[in-house]
Amino acid sequence: MEYINLYDVTKCTGCRGCQVACKQWNQLPANIVPFSGGYSTKEDTDAKTFTIIKYFEEEDANGKVTWRFRKHQCLHCGDPACMKVCPREAIFITDFGAVAKDYDKCVGCKYCVAACPFEIPKYDGEIDKVTKCEMCVDRMKVFMEKPDSTDPAKQRDKYNYVPACAKTCVTGSIKFGPKDQLLKEAEARVAFLKANGSPNANIYNPSGVGGVHKVYVLADAPEKYGLPSNPTIPSYINVWQPWIKPYGGILIGLAALGAVGSFFSTRIIKAMRIGEHEGGKTHDA
């Protein structure tokens, strides 16, 4: 059965509890960063920060300020570009839908960094690996092993093992559950928002990447929350898979040429990406 995280921006208070819970569960160190002048603690995720809350401030012609929050992390695409380009097959989709990694196989080539339409994976030079949110696969292993139960106590115990961000959210902004069930809840929520002053409310579950397993309920257009309106798997990946990927793996397997192979292969990806964008094709990244 597929599961998703459903994040409703209209219920989020920007408390950053999910950000802290993610750090704690994954045993990630704190980052000391310079003050950026905004309200976000960080401008973007990094190799040791998998989840952040982004703040967006908009002032209208009358001087009225609108605040928007958004939880920013890997969206766990149904058809992940990162997995398609990985020459070591270190990236895989779990039984419940998360996009996870086998860190023993990862060689830090950064192909996934270049390919992701959301620019999520980040390289960690200290361990020579690329990291990202994995939807707490260790917690989810326990969750999946526990059967559903009509006994409320047993069912609560099962749901103690949902991803840390969902477990800690006090407002109900982040929910975790069966995909079909939560998508129905999302549709009902959007209908409610449209009827109550948010005519542009929508579900962010882009089909261009095969749908996602971190679905958003947005009160306005995706661009208002710093999201691409129509992200797609770049067409160059169709070239990459049959022609370049096999040789990329061979290069990485040769210690003497690994750095060279990674250097040129990632630049091939980036060059194709830029060329596609300049050529006028749809591309949001």
Question: What residue ranges belong to the model's regions?
Answer:
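Non-ligating segments of multi-cofactor redox enzymes
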Residues: 1-285
